[in-house]
Every structure is written in structure tokens, then in C-alpha cells.
């Protein structure tokens, strides 16, 4: 497969420049016959989750295609689902560059992107043009300049706009790169947010005559007590699913490596054990009452199987996809 050569060339570039270059090429072919260049045939292995049928259990995690620019090209690679975003009500530039760093020896990434995106209205226009036949998730967040106390308003604004176009909606309250965002995972703040989101979902279901499930994305850095409380809140408010996990602030497995001290969330192989343990504990607490989408450090069939054995119904990749490329999709789906 050609990807090792592509990766070698891309890794000569700054990580964000490599991402921009790749997406520039994918944008050129998305929706054209040249999609055949990235298309690969993967087995159909249907999975039911959140009332939806996924053509296979492997999805693309949020963060790679923030604005939904390359849905069809990414879909051609064989993903059973694609989660675009995180998108916010208004466009925002994100944090200052540089803000994305490779930990090559650990096959990890550290990012402090800060929800850089072109806004929800732009994303919707891109979704309207797409012809992807898998499940499309849309991951939503709050603008950086929206006070945390008013954060739920941003989620509701996004829900209003994306509801007709989403297969499911992911609520991102766990990015470490938006000040104060993770506080929405706790206690009354979480309950208040989930009540508002569930009420909005009920209203939108009546308006659009369709039910779009809601999944909440959580951090891997929760304590045992916090995890129990989160699980309880998700069940009490009839949330449809949980995505575990986002990136970690823990650097214990990458000490001494180049870029290890950069501020931001760590993803990739160093996150695998931590996220799997959160999934295992979450599965015990939830006891089958809502499904788990497992993400964090999956870069092989074995890693994907570990997530499913721990309790995940579906799995997602991001950093592993950067390091291993499209062949990883086929490898996982064929052998999971």
C-alpha cells in the first residue's frame, strides 16, 4: 500500500500544514470520479446502536473533518460512520499556532486547536452537498467567548440548525482546549445541560418528525466518583449514547519524549489503556442501559477488540488513522 510513502512525505511538514495539504487534495476529489483513488472495499458488518444501523462498527472520530468538507472522500475509504465537527454556532479561529504536535515515537498527537471551525451554517452547506450513505454524526460545542454559564445556549443553537441533517448528534463537553468546558461534565451543570438538550431534542422530533439520537463525549481524566456521577446523569436524562473518550491531559506515558510538555490534549497510542479502562468502568456502571462508542488510541485490530471487549458497541479512530492511513480501516473492519 502507498500510505507509508505518503506519510513519510506528510511528516516532513508541520502537522497542521500536513493536515491542510491532505484536506486540500481530498476536497478536490470529493464528489468527483477521482474519489476512486481513495475508495476501498470493506466488508459489510451491520451493527445496531442508538436506534441506527451502522454498516460496520468503525467510525471516524470528530476533529479531523471539522467543517464537513470531505465527507464523501472519507466515506469512500470504508468508514461505517463519520463524525464531523466540533462545530460552534459562530466561526472562530481557534488557538494560536503552532497548536498540533506529533509524538512520533509514541505514535501520539498533542493538540490545542481550540474548536477552530467555520461555523455551523457553513458546515450545513457542506453536509447538503454530500452523498455519504453511512451514519453521519455531527459533534457540537460552544464558542470560546460564550461564558460557560451560558454554554448550553450554544449547544441548543447548533441542535436547532443541524437536527434535520444529522444521523446522531455528539455533545462535546470534554475538550481540554476550551477554557471551562470540562466543568460542564459535573453535577448540576451537567444535569442542567442534559435537561435542556433533551427538551430540545423532544421539540425538534415533533417539528421534523424524526428522532435523532444524542451522544455525550466525555474525558478520560474523570475520577471514579465523577465517572459514576456522569453515568448516573446520562441514564437519568435518557441520553442515547456516550462517546468515551476525548483526549487526555495525562503525560505519564510520554515523559521525556519530544513535544511531551506541550499544552493540550494527548491522543493516539498513549491514550489506549486509559480510555479502555474508562470504557470498562463505564460499562459496569451503565449495565447495558445505553451504548458506548469507544475511542482513544485505536491503531490496530487488537486495540479495537480491546475496546469492544471492555464494553464498546462501536469504535472510532483519529490519531491511528493519521499514523496508519486508510489501510487501518480495512484491517480493522475485516478482522473485528
Curated annotation (Swiss-Prot):
Catalysis performed (reactions): (S)-dihydroorotate + a quinone = orotate + a quinol
UniProt function note: Catalyzes the conversion of dihydroorotate to orotate with quinone as electron acceptor.
Gene Ontology biological-process entries: 'de novo' pyrimidine nucleobase biosynthetic process; 'de novo' UMP biosynthetic process
Cellular component aspect of the GO annotation: cytoplasm; plasma membrane
Swiss-Prot/TrEMBL keywords: Cell membrane, Flavoprotein, FMN, Membrane, Oxidoreductase, Pyrimidine biosynthesis
Record gene name: pyrD
GO terms for MF: dihydroorotate dehydrogenase (quinone) activity
Organism: Escherichia fergusonii (strain ATCC 35469 / DSM 13698 / CCUG 18766 / IAM 14443 / JCM 21226 / LMG 7866 / NBRC 102419 / NCTC 12128 / CDC 0568-73)
Amino-acid positions noted as binding FMN in the UniProt annotation, renumbered to this chain: 62-66, 86, 139, 172, 217, 245, 268, 297, 318-319
Binding-site positions, substrate: 66, 111-115, 172, 177, 246-247
InterPro entries the UniProt entry points to: Aldolase_TIM, DHO_dehydrogenase, Dihydroorotate_DH_1_2, Dihydroorotate_DH_2, Dihydroorotate_DH_cat, Dihydroorotate_DH_CS
Protein name: Dihydroorotate dehydrogenase (quinone)
Biological pathway: Pyrimidine metabolism; UMP biosynthesis via de novo pathway; orotate from (S)-dihydroorotate (quinone route): step 1/1
Enzyme class: oxidoreductase
Active site, renumbered: 175
UniProt xrefs under CDD domains: DHOD_2_like
Pfam families registered for this protein in UniProt: DHO_dh
Complex formation: Monomer.
Topology relative to the membrane: Peripheral membrane protein
Record text on cofactor binding: Binds 1 FMN per subunit.
The protein's required cofactors: FMN
Family according to the record: Belongs to the dihydroorotate dehydrogenase family. Type 2 subfamily.
Amino acid at each position: 500500500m502507498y500510505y507509508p510513502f505518503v506519510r513519510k512525505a506528510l511528516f516532513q511538514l508541520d502537522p497542521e500544514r500536513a493536515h491542510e495539504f491532505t484536506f486540500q487534495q481530498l476536497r478536490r476529489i470529493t464528489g468527483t470520479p477521482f474519489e476512486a483513488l481513495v475508495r476501498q472495499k470493506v466488508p459489510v458488518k451491520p451493527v445496531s446502536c442508538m436506534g441506527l444501523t451502522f454498516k460496520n462498527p468503525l467510525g471516524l472520530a470528530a476533529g479531523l473533518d471539522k467543517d464537513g468538507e470531505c465527507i464523501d472522500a472519507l466515506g469512500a475509504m470504508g468508514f461505517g460512520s463519520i463524525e464531523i465537527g466540533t462545530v460552534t454556532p459562530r466561526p472562530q479561529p481557534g488557538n494560536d499556532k503552532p497548536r498540533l504536535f506529533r509524538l512520533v515515537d509514541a505514535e501520539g498527537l498533542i493538540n490545542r486547536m481550540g474548536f477552530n471551525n467555520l461555523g455551523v451554517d457553513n458546515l450545513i452547506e457542506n453536509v447538503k452537498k454530500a452523498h455519504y450513505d453511512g451514519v453521519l454524526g455531527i459533534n457540537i460545542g460552544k464558542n470560546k467567548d460564550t461564558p460557560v454559564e451560558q454554554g448550553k445556549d450554544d449547544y441548543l443553537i447548533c441542535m436547532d440548525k443541524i437536527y434535520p441533517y444529522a444521523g446522531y448528534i455528539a455533545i462535546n463537553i470534554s475538550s481540554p482546549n476550551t477554557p471551562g468546558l470540562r466543568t460542564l461534565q459535573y453535577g448540576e451543570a451537567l444535569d442542567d445541560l442534559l435537561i435542556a438538550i433533551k427538551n430540545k431534542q423532544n421539540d425538534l422530533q415533533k417539528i421534523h418528525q424524526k428522532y435523532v439520537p444524542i451522544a455525550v463525549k466525555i474525558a478520560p481524566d474523570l475520577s471514579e466518583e465523577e465517572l459514576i456521577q456522569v453515568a448516573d446523569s446520562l441514564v437519568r436524562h435518557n441520553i442515547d449514547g456516550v462517546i468515551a473518550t476525548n483526549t487526555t491531559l495525562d503525560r505519564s506515558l510520554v515523559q521525556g519524549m519530544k513535544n511531551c510538555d506541550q499544552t493540550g490534549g494527548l491522543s493516539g497510542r498513549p491514550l489506549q489503556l486509559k480510555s479502555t479502562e474508562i470504557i470498562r468502568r463505564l460499562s459496569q456502571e451503565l449495565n447495558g442501559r445505553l451504548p458506548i462508542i469507544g475511542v482513544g488510541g485505536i491503531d490496530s485490530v487488537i486495540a479495537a477488540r480491546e475496546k469492544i471487549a471492555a464494553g464498546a458497541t462501536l469504535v472510532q479512530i483519529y490519531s491511528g488513522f493519521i499514523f496508519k492511513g486508510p489501510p487501518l480501516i480495512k484491517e480493522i473492519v475485516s478482522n473485528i
